[in-house]
From Swiss-Prot:
Key words of the record: Mitochondrion
Compositionally biased spans, kind Low complexity: 51-74
Family: Belongs to the mitochondrion-specific ribosomal protein mS38 family.
Protein name (record): Small ribosomal subunit protein mS38
Disordered as annotated region, ranges: 1-27, 43-101, 325-344
Main location: mitochondrion
The species this protein was found in: Neurospora crassa (strain ATCC 24698 / 74-OR23-1A / CBS 708.71 / DSM 1257 / FGSC 987)
Keyword Calcium: no
Residue ranges, compositional bias (Basic residues): 325-338
Coiled coil: none
Length: 344
């Protein structure tokens, strides 16, 4: 018996009319031989599991794979012109900004520079503050050497030439001479014109020639004992002057204690104790510093009289809070009864 799957394959195969008419007599034999030759029971039982390797024929040869690989894929070949166009279309990204490395600088030296970098982005490449040697500091106060006259003349002529070359293309108006200001008309590359007014006389005073500062002079050494004596004398003079200007007044209170005793006979005995002078505190200090010192003294005395404060645990705090809450509820509940008792 022929399997049903083989019959479907034979029925689906296309047949030309010429070949079918010529081989009409040999059709049964050819069909039987074709069916028998194409039918292989072992081929139906084989099953290839999915893998990344390409399929290979049953006999183990790799001719089909070699032939398949040798055939060029249609539509994959591209001309070099297309590749060039694609490369040209890709946008060219500008190089990213880079900062010089600071690995050679210690972290302690970069602390101040990092603080300034928080407010403004800067590239730190050296220590801050920069170390200055004594020689470079002394060069600031050294007088410059005299230059030759030829060098001075060449420098001045070059400066005049640099100033006259851009001013030659500028146009000056005659109306500005009366006002004392000079008008310069500038023409920008884009074709627009703008006028600039400035006064040479007022600007000349802002640009002064450089003059080196005088060299520093050492401070004269003074004896400490003499300085202390002068300071104490000045303080004594100030105290005496203030005492003369504002007379100092003090108020004292005298408290007399009288003790009265009674004997068994009914006689009274009176004894007076000697008074004690007590300065009156009613006089308020006049200056702000005196009042501030008095308040500080009173604060310290009150703080010492309060005693020591002891901390309690969280459990006791919660317990006290619950007691207060219960007491409030009790008072709220017995409010009417208490009011009635007060009325009676």
């Amino acid at each position: 018996m022929i399997p049903q799957s083989v019959r479907r394959v034979v029925a689906a195969a296309p047949q030309s009319p010429v070949v079918s008419s010529l081989a009409a007599s040999s059709a049964p034999r050819a069909g039987a031989s074709y069916i028998l030759s194409s039918y292989q029971p072992n081929a139906l039982q084989k099953r290839r599991y999915s893998s990344s390797k390409p399929s290979s024929p049953d006999d183990g040869s790799s001719r089909a794979f070699a032939a398949r690989a040798s055939v060029p894929a249609a539509g994959t070949s591209k001309t070099p012109g297309e590749k060039r166009k694609r490369k040209a279309k890709e946008p060219v990204m500008p190089p990213l900004p880079s900062v010089p490395s600071t690995r050679h600088i210690k972290d302690e030296a970069l602390a101040l520079s990092t603080f300034f970098a928080l407010h403004r982005p800067i590239s730190v490449t050296q220590l801050l503050p920069k170390t200055v040697t004594e020689e470079s500091f002394a060069e600031i106060f050294n007088h410059r050497k005299g230059h030759k006259a030829t060098d001075v003349l060449s420098t001045l002529s070059q400066a005049v030439h640099d100033l006259e070359s851009p001013m030659s293309g500028l146009r000056l108006s005659d109306n500005d001479v009366e006002d004392g200001s000079t008008k310069i008309s500038l023409k920008h590359p884009d074709g627009t014109e703008s006028d600039v007014y400035f006064q040479l006389n007022s600007m000349s005073g802002h640009f002064l020639p450089f003059n080196p500062p005088p060299p520093p002079e050492p401070i004269a050494e003074v004896d400490e004992a003499a300085a202390e004596a002068e300071a104490s004398a000045a303080i004594a003079e100030e105290i005496a002057a203030t005492a003369e200007q504002e007379p100092e007044t003090r108020v004292y209170k005298a408290v007399v204690t009288i003790e009265e005793t009674r004997d068994t006979n009914g006689q009274y005995k009176i004894m007076a104790h000697s008074p004690q002078l007590v300065e009156d505190d009613a006089v308020q200090p006049r200056s702000f510093l005196e009042r501030l010192a008095l308040r500080q003294i009173r604060y310290e005395e009150a703080r010492q009289q309060q005693g020591i404060m002891h901390a309690i645990s969280v459990r006791r705090q919660k317990k006290l809070k619950i007691k207060k809450k219960k007491y409030k509820k009790l008072m709220r509940r017995t409010r009417n009864e208490r009011r009635k008792q007060d009325r009676l």
